[in-house]
């Protein structure tokens, strides 16, 4: 199965512009973004760029995120024809928070408890671990692997060509 969606996210800016934004929230959640556009150059060309960073310590123990993304495009516009070279992508580092938590685990270990990356050791800290044989909680020493993360890097490059023949027909 496959498909395509023809979508315009922003109209062509005729004037130079830029924007910067900063935000901050709970659990050290933060976002920084900067965008710049050349405006129309020589009646035909536009260059746009954007950089974004999002980070958070996360609500769940060891649930931090570190996300970076970029977008760069240059486009040629000539009446009914558009040719754009576009590159976008990002890098993501997310700590593992996939495991669910039972009511008893929350009762003994708190709402933010995360068993991801946990292993038993003699030198670790105490957490309630459930014995699979009898179902009763028992205290055991555990520790957590450092950098138990998912790491992604994605780079996308596209050439987009569009020509409008008339008000009813266009080719992309």
Regions found by a protein language model. Give the residues of each.
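Acidic/polar loop-and-plug regions of large Gram-negative outer-membrane beta-barrel proteins
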Residues: 73-75, 82-158, 172
């Amino acid at each position: 199965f496959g498909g395509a969606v023809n979508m315009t996210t922003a109209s062509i800016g005729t004037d130079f512009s830029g924007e910067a934004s900063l935000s901050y929230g709970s659990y050290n959640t933060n976002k920084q973004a900067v965008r710049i556009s050349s405006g129309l150059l020589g009646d035909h060309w536009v260059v746009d760029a954007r950089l974004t960073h999002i980070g958070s310590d996360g609500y769940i123990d060891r649930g931090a995120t570190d996300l970076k993304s970029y977008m760069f495009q240059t486009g040629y516009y000539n009446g009914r024809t558009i040719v754009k070279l576009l590159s976008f992508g990002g890098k993501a580092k997310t700590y593992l928070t996939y495991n669910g938590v039972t009511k008893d685990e929350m009762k003994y270990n708190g709402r933010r408890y995360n068993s991801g990356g946990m292993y038993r050791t003699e030198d670790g800290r105490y957490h309630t671990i459930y014995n699979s044989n009898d179902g009763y909680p028992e205290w055991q020493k555990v520790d957590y692997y450092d950098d138990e993360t998912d790491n992604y890097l994605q780079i996308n490059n596209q050439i987009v060509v569009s020509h409008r023949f008339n008000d009813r027909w266009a080719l992309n």
